[in-house]
């Protein structure tokens, strides 16, 4: 009998690499390479930075797992994904993402529901601009026109002109009264009283007119 132990060991040694190759990990080997053997990353590669606190939290979940379970996580992508989704940190992030998605959808629904109301408000604003605003603008223009007329009526030049007309009117009345007196149409007492009153009014207006012309008005 020949000793085939050596050949058996050799055959087992040859079969093990084949088994290992059939269970090659889904991740890149560079992810678990030691720092001393790792090569500098190119500019196109992205390195995931994990804080010490996060790493410690993940180790807590891994420390109770068996070697076979850890190997399965490294070789089975689905198992790794399931483990990743079971982490509290990932659950919190997923919950936040789901909540934000729900809130965004709700805001979109609310905006769609308010679309008819927004259109109605736009129509009302357009009506106001074309009707009520036009009426108010017309009234404002009328008030502006009245204001200009009032300012023009009471302007210094207009007042001086009216005062001059009043002076001329009194002067004409005085001359007419003199003619009546000369023609004996009025007695002396009545003439003096009326004529004095007219001339007093005339001179008072004349003084006001002169003062207004020489002032800064």
Swiss-Prot record:
Q: Which residues form a coiled coil?
A: none
Assigned keywords, A-Z: Endosome, Protein transport, Transport
Annotated region (Disordered), positions in chain: 1-49
- Tell me the PROSITE patterns matching this sequence: VPS37_C
Q: Which spans does this entry mark as compositional bias, Polar residues?
A: 8-20
Q: How is the quaternary structure described?
A: Component of the endosomal sorting required for transport complex I (ESCRT-I), composed of ELC, VPS28 and VPS37. Interacts with ELC.
Write out the function statement from the record. Answer: Component of the ESCRT-I complex (endosomal sorting complex required for transport I), a regulator of vesicular trafficking process. Required for the sorting of endocytic ubiquitinated cargos into multivesicular bodies (MVBs).
Q: Which family does it belong to?
A: Belongs to the VPS37 family.
- Tell me which Pfam families the record gives: Mod_r
Instruction: List the record's Gene Ontology CC terms alphabetically.
Output: ESCRT I complex
UniProt-recorded name of the protein: Vacuolar protein-sorting-associated protein 37 homolog 1
Q: Compositionally biased, Low complexity: which spans?
A: 21-47
User: Where in the numbering of this chain does the VPS37 C-terminal domain appear?
Assistant: 137-217
Residue pairs linked by disulfide bridges in the UniProt entry: none
Q: Where in the cell is it found?
A: Endosome
Predominant location category? other
Example GO BP: catabolic process
């Amino acid at each position: 009998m020949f000793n085939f132990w050596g050949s058996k060991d050799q055959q087992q040694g040859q079969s093990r690499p084949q088994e290992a190759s059939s269970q090659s990990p889904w991740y890149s080997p560079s992810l678990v390479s030691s720092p001393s053997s790792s090569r500098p990353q190119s500019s196109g590669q992205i390195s995931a930075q994990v804080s010490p606190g996060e790493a410690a939290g993940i180790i807590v979940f891994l420390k109770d797992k068996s070697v076979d379970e850890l190997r399965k996580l490294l070789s089975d992508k689905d198992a790794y994904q399931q483990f990743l989704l079971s982490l509290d940190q990932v659950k919190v992030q997923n919950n936040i993402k789901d909540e934000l998605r729900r809130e965004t959808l709700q805001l979109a629904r609310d905006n769609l529901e308010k679309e008819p109301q927004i259109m109605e408000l736009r129509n009302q604003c357009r009506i106001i601009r074309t009707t009520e605003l036009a009426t108010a603008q017309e009234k404002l223009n009328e008030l502006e026109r009245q204001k200009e007329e009032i300012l023009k009526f009471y302007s210094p030049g207009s007042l001086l002109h009216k005062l001059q007309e009043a002076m001329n009117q009194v002067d004409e009345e005085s001359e007419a009264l003199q003619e009546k007196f000369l023609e004996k149409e009025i007695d002396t007492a009545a003439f003096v009283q009326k004529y004095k009153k007219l001339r007093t009014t005339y001179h008072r207006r004349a003084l006001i007119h002169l003062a207004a012309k020489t002032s800064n008005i």
